[in-house]
Amino acid sequence: MNLLIMGLPGAGKGTQAAKIVEQFHVAHISTGDMFRAAMANQTEMGVLAKSYIDKGELVPDEVTNGIVKERLSQDDIKETGFLLDGYPRTIEQAHALDKTLAELGIELEGVINIEVNPDSLLERLSGRIIHRVTGETFHKVFNPPVDYKEEDYYQREDDKPETVKRRLDVNIAQGEPIIAHYRAKGLVHDIEGNQDINDVFSDIEKVLTNLK
């Protein structure tokens, strides 16, 4: 089975990816792992990626696409299939992936799209607060401290609502054309992500069992 998993930050994509890999024994291909492996093994694309990262520069699309192609060319993929997680991030990368899969003779069989309302993601992602003295982490809504006094807690810049909203807006703008691209191919399976983790996986499991 050859799959993509998509969803906004905080939608539970990583959790569900781990469950899919465990249940269906496909190779989990996450962007971060792929980059680390390519650099550690000093592949042609890995060496190139490292040269950009060492200079603090963004890795260009063609290098990222090359690293994905290197990974998808490996023997285990033919045996197990794959779950791509964190790629493609742009419509240009989606077109590059189409080309790579065609060249390798691999067919993409499904795109799992975990849908969660952006407003509830904003609440989920921007609620984290940290105690100034103890460093303990709490959540304003889901795990509030018993003796909450606003002055005793702070938020990291990354967790502030305006920062989170910007991040979500960017992800929505980049993700929508990708979903539309795969929807036109009849590959997208929308999964309601605003429910218990196990219920989300149960819905995914039904979809994937029918694909097998």
Curated annotation (Swiss-Prot):
It is an enzyme of class 2 (transferase). It is found in: Cytoplasm. InterPro entries: Adenyl_kin_sub (IPR006259), Adenylat/UMP-CMP_kin (IPR000850), Adenylat_kinase_CS (IPR033690), P-loop_NTPase (IPR027417). ATP binds at residues 10-15, 128, 137-138, 195. One of its GO terms (cellular component) is cytoplasm. The keyword Mitochondrion does not apply. Its main location: cytoplasm. Residues 30-59 are annotated as: NMP. Keywords: ATP-binding, Cytoplasm, Kinase, Nucleotide biosynthesis, Nucleotide-binding, Transferase. PROSITE patterns: ADENYLATE_KINASE. NCBIfam families: adk, PRK00279.1-2, PRK00279.1-3, PRK00279.1-4, PRK14527.1. Consists of three domains, a large central CORE domain and two small peripheral domains, NMPbind and LID, which undergo movements during catalysis. The LID domain closes over the site of phosphoryl transfer upon ATP binding. Assembling and dissambling the active center during each catalytic cycle provides an effective means to prevent ATP hydrolysis. HAMAP family: Adenylate_kinase_Adk. Monomer. This is Adenylate kinase. It comes from Streptococcus pneumoniae serotype 4 (strain ATCC BAA-334 / TIGR4). The gene is adk.
